Amino acid sequence: MQIYQFGKIVSKNKNYLILENHGSGYLIYVPRIDRFSRDENRKIYIYEHENDYTKITYGFASFRERILFEDLISIQGVGPKTAISALNSGMQNLINLIAANDWKTLAKIPYLSEKNAKQIVFEFQKKYERFNENHKNQTEETNQDSQEKELEKNDDLADITIQKSNLEDKTAANLEDTLKMLGFKPRQIDYALTKVEPNENFENLIENAIKIISNAREFRN
């Protein structure tokens, strides 16, 4: 599974951009294209959608945005164009609407019917409630870690031992929970948790864990 492309944005239009990588150009449709700049070197998370007639690559600014896109298109009647339209309203805004069971506001998004909005909330409300809770916990832990590092730098407190094991345990628990929500099996998750290196950026931690699972021979079909 290819997770992202890294390259230079050589052109952008209203709905898509062209990313150059090792002499090849990739046409990628993205939501909220204003976030991407021409001549910028950028990592873009990708999803390749293929049917009997076409193969289109969609790109995202973050891995979490890619996950949300996949969830949206898993709903019958919601295609990639509708999912991109929904993401144009903002990823976090969309997550908050789903988590809050606000299908009425969701249904106001262009191309998204009331029926589909209700189904999205029905399928994913609990998941995105947990996503928000995990994000909140991770932010609090990151702030706590920063404060602890400041104490280590600025204060001569040799007699104080700052406990980091709880932070590590919570991060591992959040990672495990996220991988479960993404559909990975317990054996795959356990393997990733034993191999992944610590990373202060939780999204990078998820990405690295998925790479480990994808590259493991025992989990290949």
From Swiss-Prot:
Disulfide bonds: none
Chief localisation class: cytoplasm
Protein name, per record: Holliday junction branch migration complex subunit RuvA
Region spans: Domain II: 62-139
Entry remark concerning the domains of this protein: Has three domains with a flexible linker between the domains II and III and assumes an 'L' shape. Domain III is highly mobile and contacts RuvB.
Localization annotation: Cytoplasm
Domain of life: Bacteria
Species of the source: Mesomycoplasma hyopneumoniae (strain 7448) (Mycoplasma hyopneumoniae)
Taxonomic lineage of the native organism: Bacteria, Bacillati, Mycoplasmatota, Mycoplasmoidales, Metamycoplasmataceae
A Gene Ontology term for the protein's cellular component: cytoplasm
